[in-house]
Amino acid sequence: MSLSRFGAATLMLPLLLPGMGWAKEFAEPQVGEDVAMPAEAQDGTLPPLPDESRPLERGAPSEVAPTPPGRAPAPDELPVLPPLAARWGYLLRLEATTLTLLPRRGVGEDEGFIQLEPTLVIDGGEKFGFNAGARVRLRMWGGGEGAGLVRKEDWDSLSDWGQLVRALKLGADTSPVALWVGAMEGFHLVSGHLVQRYSNRTNPDYHPAGALLIGTLGPLYMEAFSSDVLGARLMGGELELDVQHVLFGRPKQPGRYTLSLSAIHDWGRGEVKSAEVTLAHLDATAVVLVQREGRRALEMHVFAGWGGRPGAGGAWGAVAGVGADSVTPTLDLRLRLEARRQHGGFRQGYFGADYELARLQAAGTSGLPLAHASFPEGYSVYAEAMVAWDAVLLGEVLQRHLHLSMGAEAFSWGRVDVDGRLAVQLLHRNLEVAVKGLAVGMRQPGARYLASGEVRWRFWGGRLYALGQGGTLLYPTAEGPLRPGAFASLGMGVDNGR
């Protein structure tokens, strides 16, 4: 498997960007530090999925020897640590915050809650991790006649119980078979041409647990996923064939020349029913440049593909592009640039950042669900960048002074879509700021905008922290149109992370 597999999954990413999932109006746990566990588990987060830690090894992220100020450690200064499997750890956390849900544009009423959020994390090393916990929102005011003590929208369906499992990992990136269960944020399915930057909790009243199964057998690599393990929603997978392996035997660098086929079906059940949709895509990828020197690597790849909507005549699309991945001890950079063609209502990245809202009501003035809304034929240019940087040594999740993920698509008929997330660590990692923005249908009537942010400040040796959050939301309604809202939260948390 080569570095160029841009897609893979990021089920654990919401834990890096707390509160940045639109559906999770209020934060997931964020950064703490070590309890004799690897840095990637220090804040209740588990080691990230392949999209965040691909086969190119950077080495262990923690226990770095002191380095003179202003100078990153040289490769030969980086420590050699015992296997992660030998370093079990745990984390306990409790957050207590006030939460206010506010109406926007004169629609709805405000509600107030006391929010309690316990968290338990068990880190079993490279092949096992578990993060459990859920928010309990106790009503202080609002909600209308008959409103209960606990906010019922958080627990009114079987799928909502999936929020108890924030992250479960069985197997490592290099295992023949591996399973991840939890929240999906910014998820790509391998090539990313069908499932691209998808988040399964964009709907603020829907809290499912998704799952990703990864398997490798000879020249075959497979990813199968479900957006909701307790409900009939998005299901599908992508099968990738290593052509060089088939023709010439096992290569020294697997995954340089591949063909892949993906298919996705939305059963449309979930908390709110919607139309069923099926899409398929065929892709070819070639890695044209590979440079490796010690713990530094650079890869460039080109790709092309064609997709369609089975059963819908004339619905097809084509794509071609180039990508680059670069990894050093302090930087992980991934770039992608694509030219796309859409025809008959098909588009690449159909299951994207906005999908859980768009399946109910697409951006624009039609008011129709995405499956029934018209999409003009034309061309587009898509660009995506993922940057992780640390001044000392890049860790898997927590040890990152900067984490940026952004995708943008501009269409020939005027529309522009942008999705981005940014998180920074300041003041010896005691201050953290995270923001997220989503804009769909810009430069067109009925454009959709969402934004949220969070600030966390650790003090008293890092065990106690203050946090504040705020942002905008869109709620589904029985009448059909999405209802705009906003939230604000302020509180404290304590854990044994330092």
Language-model segments: residues:
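Bacterial N-terminal signal peptides that target proteins for export
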Residues: 1-10
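Bacterial N-terminal signal peptides
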Residues: 9-18
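N-terminal periplasmic/intermembrane-space "pro-region" immediately following the signal or transit peptide
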Residues: 24-108, 117-129
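N-terminal low-complexity, acidic/Ser/Thr/Gly/Pro-rich segments
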Residues: 79-99, 111-115, 119-121, 129, ...
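Signature for the C-terminal beta-barrel architecture of outer-membrane proteins
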Residues: 87-91, 109, 143-144, 176-178, ...
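Surface-exposed loop and membrane-interface regions of Gram-negative outer-membrane beta-barrel proteins
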Residues: 108-110, 124-167, 194
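Long alpha-helical, hydrophobic tracts
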Residues: 150-202, 209-210
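C-terminal structured domain segments
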Residues: 432-477
